């Protein structure tokens, strides 16, 4: 009986809070509101949200749990908010699962905007650009070469390449962050990331985020999430201890060495203190959560599209043969010279346009009263950029749903996509992700022709339960080794 009364009281308080919030906004010029809650049941939410723009325009509000959120569906509105008015929208809402995932200390991806957040972001970016800059490309190339050798051992037989890509990207992050690519560590971290993301994306956690007072009630999903986070932290702490015991001052073997030594030196602005070991811990978490499955998923989508478009694969291999010589599997195009392979760059851009890393960007929060597209945006408003929607806008892109890499080959023919976000919260791992996409596809297409199993082209539709990322539906591919004449699939 007490539980029933408590639930009733919490419901009444939530309703009163919602009504009070609506009353305070009565005199503002707000974006139009989508009534009801049925949008939460849509299987492909970004596409559904884009469809609403036909009658509501590129910006509108919809109800998400106990609050209204503003959705941005065009490149123009997204860039107005996140680039031109980035300070106004650099905040992050304090969602229950975000707080739980960041229990060690605020991280970069989920942490709210502050001076500490700026210093934390600077430390992690420096680790990527300075700490391992000279060794990043050689390590990615070496690990990709080992990956191709493993694939060669399975040549001609159907391979579930999504998992292989996932292990590859995890080994790259392990090598750059910990200086270690030992199989046991790689697979432990890979399984940890898989378990954490699967648990986090479960419907029970999504409901908890939308109706926060439910956290006071028993939840098996919440228990599983706490256990997954505990496992994650155990693995990271073990590496932190190992590095502190063995690192040499003034030298760094990997990003973790660099961050541990630099954290104490980077003072936060206005004398508010300095970064702590907990910040380094969460930087490592961000690198693994944001840098493994996202890149592996993009590589998987690239393979899917090339299986559906063998004429593009043939042209890509022709481009590689022309630049490197037929069958030159040992030759490389340095990433700084990537302009030598314009079609490959265009293909990567087109895959990222159609299947952005995160279709709905993580929510932003208005740090002060502002406006977007002429509408008032009160302080504290949650704003969600629909990146995939912006990439499929028919007013910007010709035949937006078609896979056409050539659209990026004509100078100025199309605007750049927003696959990694933009503004202050653009993905820190974008340079590494783009390097990985380039190196892996170069080596893969040099070494193999990608073929579907007999009569089994993969689906172009995302997995119906994709979660944060637009996941590929399970599929297999046959990797046919290329001979010395540079054979490709041939034009269709």
From Swiss-Prot:
This is Steroid 21-hydroxylase. Its cofactor is heme b. Pfam families: p450. It is a peripheral membrane protein. PANTHER family: STEROID 17-ALPHA-HYDROXYLASE/17,20 LYASE (PTHR24289), STEROID 21-HYDROXYLASE ISOFORM X1 (PTHR24289:SF17). It is an enzyme of class 1 (oxidoreductase). CDD domains: CYP21. It catalyses: progesterone + reduced [NADPH--hemoprotein reductase] + O2 = 21-hydroxyprogesterone + oxidized [NADPH--hemoprotein reductase] + H2O + H(+); 17alpha-hydroxyprogesterone + reduced [NADPH--hemoprotein reductase] + O2 = 11-deoxycortisol + oxidized [NADPH--hemoprotein reductase] + H2O + H(+). One of its GO terms (cellular component) is endoplasmic reticulum membrane. Keywords: Endoplasmic reticulum, Heme, Iron, Lipid-binding, Membrane, Metal-binding, Microsome, Monooxygenase, Oxidoreductase, Steroid-binding, Steroidogenesis. One of its GO terms (biological process) is glucocorticoid biosynthetic process. Its EC number is 1.14.14.16. A cytochrome P450 monooxygenase that plays a major role in adrenal steroidogenesis. Mechanistically, uses molecular oxygen inserting one oxygen atom into a substrate, and reducing the second into a water molecule, with two electrons provided by NADPH via cytochrome P450 reductase (CPR; NADPH-ferrihemoprotein reductase). Heme b binds at residues 92, 121, 364, 425, 427. Signal peptide: none annotated. Progesterone binds at residue 232. The leucine-rich hydrophobic amino acid N-terminal region probably helps to anchor the protein to the microsomal membrane.
């Amino acid at each position: 009986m007490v539980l029933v009364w408590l639930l009733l009281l919490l419901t009444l308080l939530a309703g009163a809070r919602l009504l009070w919030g609506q009353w305070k906004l009565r005199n503002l010029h707000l974006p139009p509101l989508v009534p009801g809650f049925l949008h939460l049941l849509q299987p492909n939410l970004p596409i559904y949200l884009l469809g609403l723009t036909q009658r509501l325009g590129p910006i509108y509000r919809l109800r998400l749990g106990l609050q209204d959120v503003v959705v941005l569906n065009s490149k123009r509105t997204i860039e107005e908010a996140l680039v031109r008015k980035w300070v106004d929208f650099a905040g992050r809402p304090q969602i229950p699962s975000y707080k739980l995932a960041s229990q060690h200390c605020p991280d970069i991806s989920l942490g709210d905007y502050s001076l500490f957040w700026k210093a934390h972001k600077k430390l992690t970016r420096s680790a990527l650009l300075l700490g391992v800059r000279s060794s990043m490309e050689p390590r990615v190339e070496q690990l990709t070469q080992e990956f191709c050798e493993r694939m060669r051992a399975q040549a001609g037989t159907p391979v579930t390449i999504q998992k292989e890509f996932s292990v590859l990207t995890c080994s790259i992050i392990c090598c750059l962050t910990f200086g270690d690519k030992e199989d046991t560590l790689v697979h432990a971290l890979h399984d940890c990331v898989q378990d954490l993301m699967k648990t986090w994306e479960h419907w029970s956690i999504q409901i908890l985020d939308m109706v926060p007072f439910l956290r006071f009630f028993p939840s098996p999903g919440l228990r599983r999430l706490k256990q997954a986070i505990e496992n994650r932290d155990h693995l990271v702490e073990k590496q932190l201890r190992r590095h502190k015991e063995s690192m040499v001052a003034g030298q760094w073997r990997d990003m973790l060495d660099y961050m541990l030594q630099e954290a104490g030196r980077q003072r936060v602005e206005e004398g508010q203190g300095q970064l702590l070991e907990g910040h380094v811990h969460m930087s490592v978490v961000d690198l693994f959560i944001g840098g493994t499955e996202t890149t592996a998923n993009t590589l998987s989508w690239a393979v899917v599209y090339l299986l559906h478009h063998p004429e593009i694969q043939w042209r890509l291999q022709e481009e590689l043969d022309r630049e490197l010589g037929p069958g030159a599997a040992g030759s490389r195009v340095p990433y700084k010279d990537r302009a030598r392979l314009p079609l490959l760059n265009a293909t990567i851009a087109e895959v990222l346009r159609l299947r952005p890393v995160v279709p709905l960007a993580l929510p932003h929060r208005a740090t002060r009263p502002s406006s977007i597209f002429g509408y008032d945006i009160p302080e504290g408003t949650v704003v969600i950029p629909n990146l995939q929607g912006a990439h499929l806008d028919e007013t910007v892109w010709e035949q937006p749903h078609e896979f056409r890499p050539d659209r990026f080959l004509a100078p100025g023919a199309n605007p750049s996509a927003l696959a990694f976000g933009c503004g202050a919260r653009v993905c820190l791992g974008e340079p590494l992700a783009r390097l990985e996409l380039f190196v892996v596809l170069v080596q893969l297409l040099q070494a193999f022709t990608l073929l579907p199993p007999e009569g089994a082209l993969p689906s172009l539709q995302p997995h119906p339960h994709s979660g944060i990322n637009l996941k590929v539906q399970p599929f297999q591919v046959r990797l046919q080794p290329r001979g010395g004449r540079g054979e490709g699939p041939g034009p269709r």
